[in-house]
Amino acid sequence: MDIGKKHVIPKSQYRRKRREFFHNEDREENLNQHQDKQNIDNTTLKKAEKQIHKDSIDKHERFKNSLSSHLEQRNRDVNENKAEESKSNQDSKSAYNRDHYLTDDVSKKQNSLDSVDQDTEKSKYYEQNSEATLSTKSTDKVESSDMRKLSPDKNKVGHEEQHVLSKPSEHDKETRIDFESSRTDSDSSMQTEKIKKDSSDGNESSNLKSEVISDKSNTVPKLSESDDEVNNQKPLTLPEEQKLKRQQSQNEQTKTYTYGDSEQNDKSNHENDLSHHTPSKSDDKDNVMREDHIVDNNPDNDINTPSLSKIDDDRKLDEKIHVEDKHKQNADSSETVGYQSQSSVSHRSTEKRNMAINDHHKLNGQKLNTKTSANNNQKKATSKLNKGRATNNNYSDILKKFWMMYWPKLVILMGIIILIVILNAIFNNVNKNDRMNDNNDADAQKYTTTMKNANNTVKSVVTVENETSKDSSLPKDKASQDEVGSGVVYKKSGDTLYIVTNAHVVGDKENQKITFSNNKSVVGKVLGKDKWSDLAVVKATSSDSSVKEIAIGDSNNLVLGEPILVVGNPLGVDFKGTVTEGIISGLNRNVLIDFDKDNKYDMLMKAFQIDASVNPGNSGGAVVNREGKLIGVVAAKISMPNVENMSFAIPVNEVQKIVKDLETKGKIDYPDVGVKMKNIASLNSFERQAVKLPGKVKNGVVVDQVDNNGLADQSSLKKGDVITELDGKLLEDDLRFRQIIFSHKDDLKSITAKIYRDGKEKEINIKLK
């Protein structure tokens, strides 16, 4: 809301202040009308004061002028108030000291009033005898009776006025006034209210004023002059009105303390009261600064909104007191009051004022302590909050400065980190893919090699069937096992094929039917066979180029757990070319073989163990390594309940030695020592005693028969000798004896034997040729 002079306040705030201003003026007008009516009834005044502020247009104009002047003065002193903030604290301390001084001054005044009371008692006797005093007292009684009739209404009005004045406005509830800066003003207002209460007691208030007035003719003209000055003064602004109110309160307080001293003191106080209606510029400035300091120090108050209701209440109170003083002085000029009654009323009113001042000082002291502690706590909380905000601001400023100084480097660093993370993820993904590809390639290569070796081996493995006569007396299942087997083409010379198979596969037949992987068949001839090694060689002719000879490996370098493939023809031609996979389960196994199926073991075969699946028809099949090279020939398997995948193959190095002799000689020449033997484990106790065998001997053989002129006879070996070791090897039974002797078929050198003869141990050399 624009109120002129470049002052703008909110419209709602303007309306609220205007409403309060008009309410206060209406209340003041009603009060003045009531007072004028009372004065007319009491014939103390000849005419009532004229009504003021009756025109609503003048009200609006005066309110705007007063508010704009106050805001202009306040805005002009805002900067000065900041500089005077420290000074205001000192003023509060001085105000506190001034309160103590006023308390001492009141006590002094009380002493002076006591002395005046004593003088009054002395003059009491003289006044009783004075006729003039009697006439005055009679007149006083008549007029005081009239005043008592009006006193109830006056007291009632006084209470109503006090209630209206003490009622706080909405703006007063929101505004907090600094107690230190307005301490003196509040003291003066409290004392003035006490005087008002005393003045509402009818004749007592009028007698109080008449006590300090000695010359009626001099007093009445002065009061009329003061009335004219008040009526002729120009409208005051809000700061000026507040300044005037405070000065009047201070002067009234000073006058109250000086009642009863002398007539001259009363006149001087009255003149000072009238002279103080014109404020000085310096005092006006101090009051304005104090008022602005009160408004500025209140955090809940709007900086552009003064406490109008409070100012109007104070101004109204001052004007009311001033009007009452005029009424009382006019009443005193028209009445004659006895000195005795005046002094007694003055003494009672003085006591009331002193009690009110003491109570007010105590209350102000308590409020001062409470206000001071509250201000200190508020300052501490505000300082802590400001420190916290300053710390947060400092941190944010440091971060901003750091970012502004180094943001290019930080951006580059973040970019490098992100690039490293991305490259690392890419490389890890590539490496992972490479490893997966390598694994896949390795698996594919392994699978491809295995399949390649299997396909090549299949081309070298054939089906071998002997030509068993139709009138064979063998059982059908027995004949089928002997008649069908597998063979391996270990050598190819032109169209001639050399096939190795098992001796028990070819049996006693010379001709064998050979069927290739492409289902073509030829007839092969048995070149030789050896039952002790269970190997045979078949020769066949074929121009089929699909038949390949197998690559030969080395059985001396076998490794336990090495992967192997077994290729054969289980159950005959229908399942030819079957490939099974396994590993080498054992090395250097001694396997008992029963060739003639008489339930007696005939040979102790040296072989290696495999776990690949071997079925009837796989005999004579090929065992190849991962490179597809032949490392053994399938010879036997254990067929027992609850036994699976325990098969045996003859090492390829032993096979090569046997097939070479079978190709050229058709047979194998083994050394023949010319003896018959029994196992020690099969001897009974009588037989052990007969050969005088020591009890510690558990294994070995006993020579049961020696051929004449045989190698054993030539070696001095006799019947009854017990052989426990041969060629440095522990001898378990006769099969082990035959195996050791046959192992020297190629060199035929003499071997050492440890024997027991007639219970005595000795060694002899056995000749093999």
Swiss-Prot record:
Cell location: Cell membrane
Composition skew (Polar residues), residue ranges: 126-137, 202-221, 247-262, 298-308, 331-347, 366-390
Domain PDZ: 680-733
InterPro entries assigned to the protein according to its UniProt record, in alphabetical order: Chloro_Bact_Ser_Proteases (IPR051201), PDZ (IPR001478), PDZ_sf (IPR036034), Peptidase_S1_PA (IPR009003), Peptidase_S1_PA_chymotrypsin (IPR043504), Peptidase_S1C (IPR001940)
This enzyme's EC code(s): 3.4.21.-
Highest taxon of the lineage: Bacteria
Keywords associated with the record: Cell membrane, Hydrolase, Membrane, Protease, Serine protease, Transmembrane, Transmembrane helix
Enzyme class: hydrolase
Topological relation to the membrane, as annotated: Single-pass membrane protein
One Pfam family named in its UniProt record: PDZ_2
GO cellular component: a single term: plasma membrane
Gene Ontology terms: biological process: proteolysis
Family membership: Belongs to the peptidase S1C family.
Protein name: Serine protease HtrA-like
